[in-house]
Amino acid sequence: MNLHQTVEHEAAAAFAAAGIADSPIVLQPTKNAEHGDFQINGVMGAAKKAKQNPRELAQKVAEALADNAVIESAEVAGPGFINLRLRPEFLAQNIQTALNDARFGVAKTDKPQTVVIDYSSPNLAKEMHVGHLRSSIIGDSISRVLAFMGNTVIRQNHVGDWGTQFGMLVAYLVEQQKDNAAFELADLEQFYRAAKVRFDEDPAFADTAREYVVKLQGGDETVLALWKQFVDISLSHAQAVYDTLGLKLRPEDVAGESKYNDDLQPVVDDLVQKGLAVEDDGAKVVFLDEFKNKEGEPAAFIVQKQGGGFLYASTDLACLRYRIGRLKADRLLYVVDHRQALHFEQLFTTSRKAGYLPENVGAAFIGFGTMMGKDGKPFKTRSGDTVKLVDLLTEAVERATALVKEKNPELGADEAAKIGKTVGIGAVKYADLSKNRTSDYVFDWDAMLSFEGNTAPYLQYAYTRVQSVFRKAGEWDANAPTVLTEPLEKQLAAELLKFEDVLQSVADTAYPHYLAAYLYQIATLFSRFYEACPILKAEGASRNSRLQLAKLTGDTLKQGLDLLGIDVLDVM
């Protein structure tokens, strides 16, 4: 159920009865549970508009909410707020419904969409590094939530598998007579660094590299064979990282830059024909009045370089056309570093003008900040090098396994390793997903692996705590009437019934930290409930009802963490 909508519906009827039907209700959860479950804040604005006393108008709304099947009490507070407390019977009935629902009371959207989500998208011929972590796990979580809410989700891994870097690599390998040798990703990285130096310092080598790019684009069999080898090695490495992270990305989701090679010139020609792209100093450029350069002139969105070469803009335009025309997207999401914001704003604007992006199709740039070290600078190794993602994840598992062994010395090596992997990978992912994605965040091993506070280990332990209750519970009846008498029983029940509200918010806004904050709230609330309301020592209907609340808490934590891409354990 959508608890917010249910309460808002009741409030709307009360607003109508008070003569302010057209006024915004402004309903939000109370910050202090002692004041109730929800608060209406819209009366003051309505009173100002109607030139009425806000408290008197609020009292009319509160009186209209009397004898309500959903709301137990409505109390006016302050200058015109209305605090709402939900009926225990209403909460109990919906707890029962959620317990008997495989989706825990979360309804699918009544307006499902086909959502194409672009995430991870590393450049190939080099190892993935920490800079790829945020896009990969943020995109994965958003895609999970969208799919769970009933949308058709098409994941697209837009890898950088085309362009100058591959011409450089081919030129270097031919020069070094290694073009027929077998090599691994580490070799490619070494070759790439050497090729980049040659490219920057030797104009003749740079010309040769560009010639190989032309050959690659023209379908030269020898160059294509080398290119395919580079790509296969890189993608195999990337998939291993995705599997370690537990991402939903699969090889069939890869749709790299090379996929759109044949569409680039037609896109540029179409923009020229439509009068959008014009020649400027030999290049093809779309000038956008919506964006200004430093001189206050329309910004230039370059779609073809002088000499005929293509850019990210060309590829992204062709890609966007494909996703709407062939994949039939209703909504496009691009999970990319926040520094690319202007590029995507210009891409969307150009696409709207060209008719590639219809008004009924949404397109959003899902930007994110930088992972920082404790020194406040972008996260690096001690020597200042980029941290390889494989190394980071290996260290996470090793640190978590050591912590698990320290807490449970009796555990066997295999069991400790299994728990350590689940805790370590979960900790890295949650440390990111629990933060507002638009912000930078500090990578801190001690904080993320702590079993206290807003961390994955804390939530995973909360889940195991619930499971331990049921190992001792014996027989109980999940279908017996739920009875809520204690304040913390009612508070936990009300919070559990907000699951759909939170998931819909994540689906709408693409902010996974809303879900993380909700799960942490559930876990901390359950801890307070567990201490104040004995479960196994209670008797009769009270014992059974508390077990029902515990069961739904465990189910919600497990499902919610899964939507963040984090596993749980029955024992830790």
Swiss-Prot record:
Coiled-coil annotated spans: none
Q: Which PROSITE patterns match?
A: AA_TRNA_LIGASE_I
Q: Which UniProt keywords are given for this protein, alphabetically ordered? A: Aminoacyl-tRNA synthetase, ATP-binding, Cytoplasm, Ligase, Nucleotide-binding, Protein biosynthesis
Q: What is its EC number?
A: 6.1.1.19
Compartments (UniProt record): Cytoplasm
Q: What GO molecular function annotations does the UniProt record carry, in alphabetical order?
A: arginine-tRNA ligase activity; ATP binding
Question: Which reaction is recorded as catalysed by this protein?
Answer: tRNA(Arg) + L-arginine + ATP = L-arginyl-tRNA(Arg) + AMP + diphosphate
Q: What residue intervals traverse the membrane?
A: none
List the InterPro entries.
aa-tRNA-synth_I_CS (IPR001412), Arg-tRNA-ligase (IPR001278), Arg-tRNA-synth_N (IPR005148), Arg-tRNA-synth_N_sf (IPR036695), ArgRS_core (IPR035684), DALR_anticod-bd (IPR008909), Rossmann-like_a/b/a_fold (IPR014729), tRNAsynth_Ia_anticodon-bd (IPR009080)
Q: What class of enzyme is it?
A: ligase
Name the GO terms of the biological process aspect. Answer: arginyl-tRNA aminoacylation
What domain of life does the UniProt record list for this protein's source?
Answer: Bacteria
Question: Where is the short sequence motif 'HIGH' region located?
Answer: 122-132
What are the record's GO terms for cellular component?
cytoplasm
Q: Which family does it belong to?
A: Belongs to the class-I aminoacyl-tRNA synthetase family.
Assembly and partners are described as:
Monomer.
Q: What is this protein called?
A: Arginine--tRNA ligase
Gene name tied to this protein: argS
